[in-house]
Structures are given as C-alpha cells and as structure tokens.
C-alpha cells in the first residue's frame, strides 16, 4: 500500500503532484493534515474512495472545514498515520 500525507492547500504545486501520483497508483491511502484538510472542499478527492481518506479532526476544526460523508475524520489521526508508516509493506510519501 502507498501512504500519502498531504499538508499543503489544494492549489499548491506539491498538492497537484501528490494528486497526480495518487491517480497513477493503486491501493493507496491519503492522510490530510494542516492546510491539507482544505482538500476536503475540492472535487479532487473524487480520485479515491472516501473510506481511503483520513483527515485530522483537530486541523479540520481549527480551519472550519466540514467533513465530507465517508471521509475518516480521526481523533487518533497521528497514531493511525504512524502505524501505517511503520508497516514495512507500505511506501510513504509526504507533500
């Protein structure tokens, strides 16, 4: 599995690269933290099944970003992220 961590807003060139790589990948999970949670307000998230998207609830609340149906808004966001990162079968990419 490929794990993507996005901390940039949707129009940032790094975000665009992240979404491009996700489109070309299979078996992926997307973690949204910091300004990355603004991606929940864009259509770009249609590239993944919503249950494969994890958002930091604390960052969403701090920025006033509502959660989309099906997206995992996690209180234990960083714990889940670290568990996925530490699994030796997973590749990790940070943007």
Which stretches of residues belong to each language-model region?
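Hydrophobic anchor at the start of a short beta-strand
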Residues: 2, 27-28, 53
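Short, glycine-rich nucleotide/cofactor-binding loops
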Residues: 2-15, 34
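Short beta-alpha junction loops
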Residues: 34-38, 58-60
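Short, well-ordered alpha-helix to beta-strand connector turns
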Residues: 25, 50-51, 88-90
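A glycine-rich helix N-cap at a beta->alpha junction
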Residues: 45-70
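C-terminal structural segments of small proteins and small subunits
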Residues: 65-95
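Histidine-anchored nucleotide/phosphate-binding helix
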Residues: 10-30
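Short, T/G/N/S-enriched strand-turn elements that build extracellular solenoid repeat scaffolds
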Residues: 19, 41-45
């Amino acid at each position: 599995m490929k794990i993507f961590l996005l901390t940039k807003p949707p129009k940032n060139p790094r975000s665009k690269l992240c979404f491009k790589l996700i489109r070309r990948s299979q078996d992926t999970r997307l973690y949204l933290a910091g300004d990355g949670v603004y991606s929940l307000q864009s259509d770009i998230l249609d590239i993944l099944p919503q249950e494969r998207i994890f958002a930091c609830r604390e960052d969403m609340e701090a920025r006033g970003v509502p959660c989309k149906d099906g997206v995992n808004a996690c209180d234990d966001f960083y714990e889940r992220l670290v568990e996925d990162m530490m699994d030796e079968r997973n590749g990790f990419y940070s943007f």
